[in-house]
């Protein structure tokens, strides 16, 4: 949030794309045994084309993922469902891609200008995730969330954080170990 504000105060137009909005329906992923980390879990072609378009200065319309019902606004072919409501994103000078692994996907890495990994201590990360997953997305029951958060940290470090650290351009480490 502070980084966004700093860019905007400098006259830059800023927007963000949340990678999770490109998830396909959870029921489909579970039926196919697809893990949520990786392009198989996404409306991948739509994600890739959206990045191409927005980096060319075009407005994009992306899927909207409903975290309560675990469904996408788009069908498996990437078309808007009859009751779907996409997210409209205007082009900007600075485009943040929020997600656990966007620059680990070879097909889109060339579309990402500066690859930044932002590390924080568990209490800070948990507060941010609580705000997003409990307050905003209404995704988890609080006790389940706390248990899942600490259970999954090592797994996420292995499949997402460490690999990204190996290929990022900048690592912003605000953790106590920095």
Question: Where in the sequence are the language-model features?
Answer:
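A conserved segment at the C-terminal end of the G1
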Residues: 1-11
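Short, structured coil segments at secondary-structure junctions
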Residues: 10, 110-112, 166-167
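Conserved beta-strand scaffold positions in the cores of enzyme catalytic domains, especially
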Residues: 14-16, 115-117, 169-173
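Conserved nucleotide-sensing/catalytic segment adjacent to the nucleotide-binding pocket
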Residues: 15-19, 24-80, 94
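Short, glycine/acidic-enriched loop or turn micro-motifs at the edges of active sites
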Residues: 21-23, 101, 122, 176
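ATP-dependent NMP and nucleoside kinases share a basic, alpha-helical "lid"
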Residues: 78-136
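Small-molecule kinase domains that catalyze NTP-dependent phosphoryl transfer to phosphate-bearing small molecules
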Residues: 136-178
